[in-house]
Amino acid sequence: MFEVKNSRGYIQGLFDSIIRKDIQQRFKIRYIESLRMLANHMIDNFGQEIIYSDLAERFGFGSSHTAENYVSYLKQTYLLLGIHKFSFKSKERIRNEKSYVVDTAFITERDDAMNGQNIGWKLENITYVELLRRNKPLFYDVFYYREQYEIDFVVCEGN
């Protein structure tokens, strides 16, 4: 392990590199500032259900399909992780996706960080990442289950 003297600068540099090199260059994104604002918004609002039409309207994308693509790019570069709601109905599983942040340092150490103080949300994020780390290699699926204000996770084997 090595010690980073300026953790905020390091994390911000990593974030900028993911946006510019891993996403903009790879996917030929023209509106980089919109992507950056979306990425910051998704990190600040981790653990919330994703509504692509709202994102498209908020960031001025031409369609919800564009917002969905941009969020997909953030997941493909491992900045965000997606999770679906547990339901026996496939339509509900697909429709109600949430996102979490791969590394909680992005929540607290970015220059535009807004949501670093809510310890409950950070613990929920850490719990999901750890469940995924432990169960994905075993081909288990992890879902979220919401009952009023409580968020629980469900781990399922196979289908």
Where are these regions (language model features)?
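Accessory nucleic acid-recognition modules appended to NTPase machines
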Residues: 2-158
